Design a protein with these regions (language model features):
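Parallel beta-helix/beta-solenoid
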Residues: 2-15, 20-22, 26-48, 66-76, ...
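Glycine- and acidic/polar-rich repeat regions and solenoidal domains
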Residues: 25, 47-63, 79-371
Length: 371
């Protein structure tokens, strides 16, 4: 047994609890729909790693079902993931298993790419099977991989009002699939009013997250990577009214509208350089059926009415082939000290920022809409 103890703790003198149960609340089969879990303390699970290419276990999760409500719980001390909205196997159970058996001999990432091709082009899934969950007002912390994880099963879900912190701290693991929230194919999901901090990466939207709305969230101290990472997605995705305070705020692919955000960290994005560029899926609107694949060229980003401060600027783009639009954004002079500070008090968190120059003067600005 390999163990890591807090500094100053001698396991020969202290009491040591070893968690061996793989999950706390997790069905033993798929398709158990419309379950509500409310008001519990759920803790101490030896969960396995949750990749998108195999079963994705969590301390709690629907295991490929529809319409769960998980709210007002404390979810903590999961070896890997807190809440899993992911799949129960590679592919989606009865669909994927109906395909003829085959051995995937492609080297490196080619194996996973071919599996994904088979899965999406020959074994798609529908809204009747999974998704449409409500994950609300939970405190999720001290998980080794992710606070919330899910491939496909998070589609059409509402994730709101959660406090997610201290995820993947202490360098227990390294690699991919680690974040406060990590979702693949989260079509039409809404992530709003969450508070995500002290994680290896705040929010990671990966392959196929189409129609996602990320609104009204507070991110800070996610300083190993970024507050928000959107990887090889084609959009449309909306990122609006968020407060992004970490050193690196945004790393974006394409097809994204960023509106009314306070951005204090670096802003980057551009052409996908992984494995020489990838062809990734896009879908019929508000659906689950792939209608094609396209390269991720970078760009097609729209920036409206954002406030950029401290490290934030629009100067770092990596070969964006698609056009970008900028209008109504305000950038603070890097020489000015806005003293942006997040203060924790007994009744909540407060944002403090010093107004500089002529910011307090009235100024007429053109109304910008998407109409």
């Amino acid at each position: 047994i390999w163990a890591q103890f807090p500094e100053g703790i001698d396991p020969n003198e202290a009491s040591v609890e070893i968690a061996v149960r793989p999950q706390v609340f997790y069905p033993d089969k798929t398709g158990i729909n419309y379950i509500t879990v409310r008001g519990f303390i759920l803790e101490n699970a030896a969960t396995n790693w949750a990749p998108p290419s195999a079963e994705q276990p969590g301390l709690i999760g629907p295991r490929w079902a529809k319409g769960w409500v998980i709210e007002n719980n404390v979810i903590r001390n999961s070896r890997c993931s807190g809440i899993s909205l992911g799949r129960s196997t590679f592919g989606h159970a009865h669909h994927y298993q109906e395909l003829p058996p085959r051995i995937y001999a492609e080297p490196g990432g080619g194996q996973t790419l071919q599996q994904l091709t088979d899965y999406f082009e020959k074994a798609s899934w529908t809204k009747e099977e999974a998704g449409f969950h409500v994950i609300r007002n939970n405190e999720i912390y001290e998980c080794g991989q992710a606070g919330i994880v899910g491939c496909s099963g998070g589609a059409f879900s509402l994730i709101e009002g959660n406090e997610i912190h201290d995820i993947c701290q202490g360098e227990t693991f390294e690699g991919d699939e680690m974040a406060g929230i990590k979702l693949h194919f989260a079509n039409d999901a809404v992530l709003r009013n969450n508070h995500i901090y002290r994680t290896i990466r705040g929010l990671w939207l990966d392959w196929g997250s189409q129609g996602v709305q990320v609104t009204g969230n507070l991110f800070h101290e996610n300083d190993v990577q970024e507050d928000i990472f959107v990887e090889v997605c084609h959009g449309p995705i909306l990122i609006a009214n968020n407060i992004l305070l970490s050193r690196h705020s945004l790393n974006l692919s394409q097809g994204i509208a960023c509106v009314h955000n306070l951005i204090c960290g670096e802003v980057t994005g551009g052409k996908d350089r992984c494995a020489g560029g990838r062809l990734t899926f896009y879908y019929e609107p508000h659906g689950t059926v792939s209608v094609g694949k396209a390269p991720n060229l970078g760009g097609d980003l729209q920036w409206y009415n954002n406030l950029l401060a401290e490290r934030a600027s629009f100067d770092r783009w990596d070969e964006c082939a698609l056009p970008m639009k900028f209008e109504g954004n305000a950038s603070a002079d890097p020489a000015s000290d806005l003293e942006v500070e997040l203060i924790k008090k007994t009744d909540g968190w407060y944002l403090s920022m010093k107004a500089v120059g002529n910011w307090l003067q009235k100024e007429k600005r053109r109304l910008i809409t998407t109409a």
